[in-house]
UniProtKB/Swiss-Prot annotation:
Family that this chain belongs to: Belongs to the acylphosphatase family.
Coiled coil: none
Reaction catalyzed: an acyl phosphate + H2O = a carboxylate + phosphate + H(+)
Name of the protein described by the UniProt record: Acylphosphatase
NCBIfam families: PRK14451.1
Transmembrane helix recorded as keyword: no
PROSITE patterns, A to Z: ACYLPHOSPHATASE_1, ACYLPHOSPHATASE_2, ACYLPHOSPHATASE_3
InterPro entries on file: Acylphosphatase, Acylphosphatase-like_dom, Acylphosphatase-like_dom_sf, Acylphosphatase_CS
Active-site positions on this chain: R21, N39
GO molecular function, one term: acylphosphatase activity
Alphabetical UniProt keywords: Hydrolase
Organism in which the protein naturally occurs: Legionella pneumophila (strain Corby)
């Protein structure tokens, strides 16, 4: 059985105003990942995501590229213990 865990990522570059959070939500829902994404005042996007380890790996790979109009310069990741979220929200 695949392990369930959470991760917190900080994404910097041209990641605000390019549908990054909405695109992340769409993919997260397809991968059955819960959590949230929000813009930060310093121009980064913060993502907290929980799901099966293999699905989180796929999601993280996408976060490193982002949607078509984004430019990701840095994407950091911290693995965290499982938390039970119901949906993936854009904050």
């Amino acid at each position: 059985m695949t392990k369930e865990l959470c991760m917190r990522c900080y994404i910097s570059g041209r990641v605000q105003g390019v549908w990054f959070r909405a695109s992340a939500k769409k993919l997260a829902e397809q991968l059955m990942i819960s959590g949230w994404a929000r813009n930060l005042a310093d121009g980064r996007v913060e993502v907290f995501a929980c799901g099966k380890e293999d699905k989180l790996e796929e999601f993280y790979t996408w976060l490193q590229k982002g949607p078509l109009n984004a430019r990701v310069d840095v994407c950091t990741r911290e693995n965290l213990p499982w938390e039970d979220y119901i949906s993936f929200d854009v904050l």
